[in-house]
Amino acid sequence: MMGYQTNSNFSMFFSSENDDQNHHNYDPYNNFSSSTSVDCTLSLGTPSTRLDDHHRFSSANSNNISGDFYIHGGNAKTSSYKKGGVAHSLPRRCASCDTTSTPLWRNGPKGPKSLCNACGIRFKKEERRATARNLTISGGGSSAAEVPVENSYNGGGNYYSHHHHHYASSSPSWAHQNTQRVPYFSPVPEMEYPYVDNVTASSFMSWN
């Protein structure tokens, strides 16, 4: 029994001695470095990790954009992206001829800058003609005979209102002469010479 205990004690002592030797020879840094290599920057949030995160975020955005570009058939104009917070607007069209190119946009019946240059000029002309017709109808019409004409003889005024007076004042003197009785020869010899009243006797009977 004693020999067994001695052997057991010896074995226990030997094992404990080996444990102490292993404990003194244990280096946690060497064992940790030999088992695996760990980058300490992953847990500290250093610039290198932030740069990696930014690179991954940029890669994800580029993949999404390329996917959307593929879905829209490669047509960048039909995409619904917003630049600067403003969506792409449709090109302006003329309300009359549906053109999209013009040197100048003009106001029309549908609002400001709703007509192209040519349609805007035509619309303005028609608007002026309609306004002139309305003024003519409301004013009872106008004619050239009603327009006053400057009379150089009377120093102004309406020519038609003073025309009769001007004609009377500028007529020749023989028009105001009294009628005179002028004898003429009768075909019957026994009859007396009759007399006729003639205003213009002095002009065409100068032989008398």
UniProtKB/Swiss-Prot annotation:
Highest taxon above the source species: Eukaryota
Q: Which SUPFAM superfamilies match?
A: Glucocorticoid receptor-like (DNA-binding domain) (SSF57716)
- One Pfam family from the UniProt entry? GATA
Q: Does the keyword Nucleus apply?
A: yes
Give this protein's Gene Ontology molecular function annotations.
Answer: DNA-binding transcription factor activity; transcription cis-regulatory region binding; zinc ion binding
What SMART domains does the database record attribute to this sequence? Answer: ZnF_GATA
One GO cellular component, as annotated: nucleus
Arranged from A to Z, the UniProt key words for this protein are:
DNA-binding, Metal-binding, Nucleus, Transcription, Transcription regulation, Zinc, Zinc-finger
Keyword Chaperone on entry: no
Q: Does the entry annotate any disulfide bonds, and if so which pairs?
A: none
First and last residues of each zinc finger (GATA-type): 94-119
Please state where this protein is localized.
Nucleus
Family (UniProt)? Belongs to the type IV zinc-finger family. Class B subfamily.
Function (record text): Transcriptional regulator that specifically binds 5'-GATA-3' or 5'-GAT-3' motifs within gene promoters.
The protein's name in its UniProt record: GATA transcription factor 20
Q: What species is this protein from?
A: Arabidopsis thaliana (Mouse-ear cress)
**Lineage summary:** Eukaryota, Viridiplantae, Streptophyta, Embryophyta, Tracheophyta
